[in-house]
Amino acid sequence: VSYGKIKRTPGQLTLERAKEIFEGVQPEAVKIGLTIAEDIEEITENLKEVLPDVLHLSGNIEGISPEQVRELKNRFPGLKIMQAIPVLQNVPLEEQKALEYVKQYEAVSDFFLIDTKADTANDIGATGLTHDRSIDRAIIESTSVPCIIAGGLDASNVAKAIAETRPYGVDSFSLTNFDHVEEGKSCKDPEKVKAFIEASLSA
């Protein structure tokens, strides 16, 4: 759930709506909050209002240092961090900073979410674009932090991606939404989600 006091993306929810959603799910459900904010004071204020189990940091990775991530964890004991790791399309691994980021952030991250980063965007993910899965595999093999793969995944390709990378988990945003929704918003298509889960479990 993406939420915050300052509206940063079209689909971001208000603090009030995020709180309603978190309070409405089953007790055993893991509540994940997402932010692209790069100011830990802004993030802190949001977390004081609505505290998830896991915070997905999906903004410009260089906008929040590992030391600042550690400070967030110190302020909210028990909060787990899922750090997005950006992967560029059509760029060889040796020309990317993904492995460097992994080494920098693994001491303060509970999970990595490996996702496609568009050339024109500061934040990571929500592109619907895939990338070279051998890069995912290299990242996964380089760290003990559980890695979730993302980027252009749907029911048609997720099993192959799992077979190629053996990740901790998989994530889909763009390609499991309805095809036609109001501009700037997204809405999950239950049939696409069901197919995605079934394909994932079959891998």
Model-derived segments and spans:
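Glycine-rich phosphate-binding active-site loops on the catalytic face of alpha/beta enzymes
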Residues: V1-R8, H56-I64, T116-A121, E164-V193
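Conserved anion-binding
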Residues: S2-K7, G24-A29, E41-L47, V54-S142
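Conserved Radical SAM active-site core
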Residues: K7-I21
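Short, conserved glycine- and acidic-residue-centered signature motifs
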Residues: G11-T14, L129-D132, S186-D189
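C-terminal helical cap(s) of enzyme catalytic domains, especially alpha/beta-barrels
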Residues: R17, F22, E67-L72, F173-A203
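Hydrophobic anchor at the start of a short beta-strand
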Residues: K31, I81, C147, P167
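Glycine-rich beta-to-alpha transition loops that act as phosphate-gripper elements at the mouths
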Residues: L34-I40, I85-V91, I149-S156
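A C-terminal functional module that forms or caps the active site or interfaces directly
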Residues: I148-A163, N177-H180
